[in-house]
Regions:
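Active-site mouth loops of central-metabolism enzymes
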Residues: 3-29, 94-100, 127-138
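Gly-rich Lys/Arg/Thr-decorated short loops/hinges at beta-loop-alpha junctions or inter-strand turns
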Residues: 9-16, 36-45, 121-128
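Catalytic beta/alpha-barrel core
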Residues: 43-49, 70-78, 93-103
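Glycine-rich, proline-tolerant flexible connector loops at the mouths of alpha/beta enzymes
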Residues: 35-70
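Conserved small/polar residues in nucleotide/adenosyl-binding loops
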Residues: 143-144
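Acidic (Asp/Glu)-rich catalytic clusters
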Residues: 35-36, 84-89, 107-117
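Short, well-ordered coil/turn segments that N-cap beta-strands
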Residues: 1, 38-40, 68-71, 90-93, ...
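Short, charged, surface-exposed secondary-structure boundary motifs
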Residues: 102-110, 130-131
């Protein structure tokens, strides 16, 4: 089973506060706790404006990697951000979450092909939305 530690996410108020204050100890403690709890990946999501996101993720990834060897799950809705932030990781990790909207998969899949070991959580939503039933989900999975 793959377990993704999702507790370093700027959508969580205490994490957003730590990010705003650049509280490295808070981020590191969250990474240690998730490592000790058996996570397979440590998710890293800044949830800040896109103009600040790459540099914020760099800082967060550096904090995490200073206390654990677990791979990073780089988490952003922006493929532009993902295509930069993965470079800060010491080892292959996970792109979390890439949807079928627009050209998002077209942007990330070539990066994965050029960087063996990277994985992806691919969402079945596309420009028409989230599939409403199992048949539609099965139809869309062929795109991935």
């Amino acid at each position: 089973m793959i377990i993704i530690g999702e507790k370093i996410n700027g959508s969580i108020p205490s994490v957003a506060d730590a990010i705003a204050r650049r509280d490295a100890d808070f981020i590191k403690q969250r990474a240690i706790a998730q490592t000790e709890a058996g996570a397979t990946f440590i998710d890293c999501c800044a949830s800040v404006p896109e103009a600040q996101e790459v540099e914020t993720l760099r800082w967060m990834i550096d904090c995490i990697q200073s206390v654990t060897d677990l791979p990073i799950s780089v988490d952003s809705p922006s493929t532009k951000v993902l295509s930069e932030a993965y470079k800060f990781c010491n080892k292959p990790g996970l792109f979390n979450s890439v949807s079928g909207e627009g050209h998002k998969m077209d942007a990330i899949f070539p990066i994965m092909a050029e960087n063996p070991g990277w994985q992806v959580i691919a969402l079945l939503s596309d420009d028409t939305g989230i599939p409403k039933n199992a048949a539609d989900r099965l139809d869309r999975k062929s795109v991935v």
